[in-house]
Every structure is written in C-alpha cells, then in structure tokens.
Amino acid sequence: MKIHDFKNKKQEQKKISMLTCYDYPSACIIANSNIHCVLVGDSVAMAVHGHPTTIMATIEMMELHTQAVARGLGKQFLITDLPFLGHKSSQGHTVENVKRLLQAGAQAVKIEGADKDTCQTISHLVNAGIPVMGHIGLTPQSIHQLGGYKVQGKNSEQAETLLQQADALEQAGCFAVVIECVPQGLAKTITDSLVIPTIGIGAGPGTDGQVLVWHDMLGLQTSFNPKFVKKYFRAKDHFIEALNSYVQQVQQMHFPANEHSF
C-alpha cells in the first residue's frame, strides 16, 4: 500500500484495515496477510514492556521496534507513533525525532492532538515531505489531562471541538486521521466532513477504516477487555496449552523423541 492509496480507498468506499505491530516475527506473519497498513504504536510501552500508560514510550523504544517491524513487513504501509512530548519542545527537536523513525523504516508518523502548535508542527513536517497521520478523540498521551480512558465527544461542545480538530488536521496536511473512543454518530459525521480518510478504534463502523492492537485482537492477554475490541483468536489459551503439553512430554520422556535427536 502506498500513501496515495489511503485517499483512493476512501473515494472508492473501500475500508482500510490497520493493525499494530511491535516485533519482527509478528511483522512476518502480517506480511503474509491482507492487512493494508501497520502502526508501530506507542502502545508498545503497555503491550510489550508492561507499563501502565503509553507515556513511558521513548523515541529510542519506538526506533528499535520500528526497525524490527520494518525488517519483517512486505507490502503493508508502515506508520510509527511519535511518542509522548516528541513534538512539543521545538521544531528542530521534532524533525530530529521524526528523522530517526523514518531512518528506522517508518514511511509516516502519527502525531496525537490538534492544538494550534501541533497543527503548525504537522504542517512543517508535511511541507518537508513527511507524511503525517493525525489522532483525535481519546489521545492516550494526554490521559492524565483527560481524566482517564473515557469516551470523548459525548456532549455538543466536545463534538464541535472534535469536528474543528479534524478539519484543522486536514488543513495542516495529514493524509489520514485516527478517531479513538468517540460515539459512532459523531465519528461518521467527522468522516463525512473530511476528504482524507478516518481510521477508527472504538468509533463505530462509519469510519473509513479500523485499527486494533495485535495483542488485543489475537487474545494474547485477557486482563484488558475494552468494549471496542473483538478477539479473533484465543492465543493466550492456546499458548498455555502448548506450554503445559511441553512440560508433560518432558516429564513423561516423550520429548525429545528419536526424530528430535542426532
């Protein structure tokens, strides 16, 4: 998938599928699938490193995981999150951070928020030839400011703000925007108001595409079960079953068998 395919898919009313990925083996699996694009999300801090929020993601962490994913991917378009405060100090610092992610293998970066400074930074990056994906609604890097993981845009004032933010990101030059944890009616209204495609997570079926976290949709963990996640596989249960089978076969001396020995 190429950058121009995002807008083309919206025009053709073909839904976009995006999935997070954080490591080489997972990327190799995705490379053999029909997934359109991959996000090395700052959710890696939680899903892989065990932190309670995405705030703990660093540029070094994002760079390392981007390199690993890029080595395994095939035709999928690769986007990497700019981590917490990665674009807030200065434009020079932002450009340097983005440069590291692009050199690691990302084809675009995703930036959370749509305040005036963020939109100016996005415009600067786009003018420099760097594709940027926006992100509005529940923005996990601002979780303390938002007061927790809550649905955004539930009242008319918040809804109007999100509509304005989406427009501002489009005007800044974003090629797409993620809408997270927003009522489905509002997400559809935002989607219809934009030329660029929207990618929803917890935003209903009316967006131009969907994104889920690898570990969530495959059932690799069961302690986090948000309403918007559908588990397409029970990987954790199958993994535990395989581990226990291994232990049993070792104890019963069924492994290694002759075919596993020299």
UniProtKB/Swiss-Prot annotation:
Homodecamer; pentamer of dimers. GO terms for biological process: pantothenate biosynthetic process. Keywords: Cytoplasm, Magnesium, Metal-binding, Pantothenate biosynthesis, Transferase. This is 3-methyl-2-oxobutanoate hydroxymethyltransferase. Catalyzes the reversible reaction in which hydroxymethyl group from 5,10-methylenetetrahydrofolate is transferred onto alpha-ketoisovalerate to form ketopantoate. It is an enzyme of class 2 (transferase). Its main location: cytoplasm. It comes from the Bacteria. It catalyses: 3-methyl-2-oxobutanoate + (6R)-5,10-methylene-5,6,7,8-tetrahydrofolate + H2O = 2-dehydropantoate + (6S)-5,6,7,8-tetrahydrofolate. 3-methyl-2-oxobutanoate binds at residues 42-43, 81, 110. Belongs to the PanB family. Its cofactor is Mg(2+). One of its GO terms (cellular component) is cytoplasm. InterPro entries: Pantoate_hydroxy_MeTrfase, Pyrv/PenolPyrv_kinase-like_dom, Pyrv_kinase-like_dom_sf. Pathway: Cofactor biosynthesis; (R)-pantothenate biosynthesis; (R)-pantoate from 3-methyl-2-oxobutanoate: step 1/2. The active site is at 180 (proton acceptor). Mg(2+) binds at residues 42, 81, 112. Binds 1 Mg(2+) ion per subunit. It is found in: Cytoplasm. Its EC number is 2.1.2.11. It holds the Pfam family Pantoate_transf. GO terms for molecular function: 3-methyl-2-oxobutanoate hydroxymethyltransferase activity; magnesium ion binding. It comes from Legionella pneumophila (strain Corby).
